[in-house]
Amino acid sequence: MTETRPNRLLDAIDTPSDLKGRSRADLKQIAAEVREEVVDVVSVTGGHLGSGLGVVELTVAIHSVFDTPDDKLVWDVGHQCYPHKILTGRKDRMRTLRQGGGLSGFTKRSESEYDPFGAAHASTSISAGLGFAKSRDLQNKDNHVICVIGDGSMSAGMAYEAMNNAGADRSRMIVILNDNDMSIAPPVGAMSHYFSRLVSSRPYRGLRRIAKKVVQPMGLESPARRAEEYLRGFAMGGTLFEEMGFYYIGPVDGHDLDTLLDLLENIKAMQDGPILLHVVTQKGKGYAPAENSADKYHGVSKFSVVTGEQAKGAGGPPSYQKVFGQTLAKLGETDDKICAITAAMPSGTSTDIFGKKFPDRHFDVGIAEQHAVTFAAGLAADGMKPFCAIYSTFLQRGYDQVVHDVAIQQLPVRFAIDRAGLVGADGATHAGSFDIGYLGALPGFVCMAPSDEAELARMVLTSLEIDDRPSAVRYPRGEGVGVVIPDLLKPLEIGKGRVVREGTSIAILSYGTRLQEALKAAEMLAAQGLSATVADARFAKPLDNELIERLAREHEVLVTIEEGSRGGFGSFVLEHLANCGGLDAGLKVRVMTLPDVFQDHDTPAAMYDQAGLTARHIAARAIEALGRGDLSAIERLASA
């Protein structure tokens, strides 16, 4: 529950309608209290802090002026939605944010009528908003559609595809560009430079006095220049957005609540065509530790409100991300053709480790996965050795490029697929569930998954040495298992797995980091006198057919397990066994995958338990297939 404090106006705000009729002074106090609440909440739950702090005044202004949920408010990505949730009937549940059974960290249709469209991936808001606008027109309704998109999301082509459509169609909608010059990493590319020019170009001296009436000082080097650029563009039609058919207003101070309220009231009354309001905000606004941090506290763990110091976990093995980055950087010392590519995630993927050593060979292309893939293909086509590091969930955005530009041409692009499997607090939108199936379907691809951090290091080297076709290594978020990574790495033999424990009646074939759970399951089975072989597949493509056939021939039961959806590794194994006659002698096969649902957020451990992919689940499936053994004993061992 949110703590009730004396004289706190926010306690009386249950829905946006409670903002109506409030004085400007009240709204400013409510904004200050929302900012304080966001800091308090995220200090307890962890999450995305800086983005929300930057849009507090904008959020209060939008909900004060417009009539949500009848007016449709679509947030891009959703990192900045915490103030919105506080004002739309969810403030009493904010401390469940990103917790199992609690509020999502993003907008979510099933959570509230004030979330008309779910978000988590970038650059979708304008397309969705245009859909709402056209639906409104076709149904002869009269509501407004407002999309809020950050400058980082404007590096993706989808945003411009939607603007091109909306501008040509003259659809009545409002796009608010939240320009904080900071997505997760600093924005890159020509569009980022364009926004910078918009807010810093040489002022027209004759407009200075008028400009200062539009935007009051906000602590920037020359605040009036932002408004002057708008006035210059208004008079001369001089902005990219106007060329695309939008009526452009801005840049304006996104923290000046009076200006925002006045502008939005005027914009609300405009009835012709699409409008783009360009607001300039400061990520982390109002909380000094965030303002002074390089990443503006984009994503944080629990922290002290007083000092801003984030909680640190107990020291443990290095993360898979760090192992990838360190291995690539080490290989880069002896091979100057290695390049690293990331789509706005240099620190998340740890390509920044490589980039610090070799800045000329490190490319952050912004939120542009399609471009990242084909850019890597171009590098590979001319003899370079690109590693394209992208989260599994985001690689989906560039799948056509993977097929058309990489796979068909058999170009040796090396994909480092981060955040494979279940990721925890970010939930279904960020789960890396599908890459095993969608890459395994492509002719010629080499698909690998390590069982531990040493295996990952070897697979990075193995990818480097594959120079005649594309390859991919998938690995999860989080720490390794604590094995030692040898100084001298040796590449793997392509398409060959390994047996890590020999047994007789049951075979467990693991692809990826569920191997540790498979070994625990083997111990549980051994406690009942059941002998289990445990094998590490290493490759989903090409399969180790010799190993699979041996496991089928020498055991009564074969269980496959993977951190991916149906239609992946287990399906490949089953298809091979069916075609080679491996099922003809009565082998019992059980395929263990992620369930056929989109799982809600929770801790990764809880999510894998819900998915049925822990040691006790593996042992239970083996006993069920074998037809002997004590299932209740497995439960007792698991809870011991």
Curated annotation (Swiss-Prot):
It is an enzyme of class 2 (transferase). It comes from the Bacteria. The keyword Metal-binding applies. It catalyses: D-glyceraldehyde 3-phosphate + pyruvate + H(+) = 1-deoxy-D-xylulose 5-phosphate + CO2. Mg(2+) binds at D151, N180. Thiamine diphosphate binds at H79, A120, H121, A122, G152, S153, N180, Y287, E369. Pathway: Metabolic intermediate biosynthesis; 1-deoxy-D-xylulose 5-phosphate biosynthesis; 1-deoxy-D-xylulose 5-phosphate from D-glyceraldehyde 3-phosphate and pyruvate: step 1/1. Keywords: Isoprene biosynthesis, Magnesium, Metal-binding, Thiamine biosynthesis, Thiamine pyrophosphate, Transferase. Disulfide bonds: none annotated. Its cofactor is Mg(2+); thiamine diphosphate. The keyword Flavoprotein does not apply. GO terms for biological process: 1-deoxy-D-xylulose 5-phosphate biosynthetic process; glyceraldehyde-3-phosphate metabolic process; terpenoid biosynthetic process; thiamine biosynthetic process. GO terms for molecular function: 1-deoxy-D-xylulose-5-phosphate synthase activity; magnesium ion binding; thiamine pyrophosphate binding. Binds 1 Mg(2+) ion per subunit. Binds 1 thiamine pyrophosphate per subunit. Its EC number is 2.2.1.7. Catalyzes the acyloin condensation reaction between C atoms 2 and 3 of pyruvate and glyceraldehyde 3-phosphate to yield 1-deoxy-D-xylulose-5-phosphate (DXP). Belongs to the transketolase family. DXPS subfamily. Homodimer. HAMAP family: DXP_synth. This is 1-deoxy-D-xylulose-5-phosphate synthase. It comes from Hyphomonas neptunium (strain ATCC 15444).
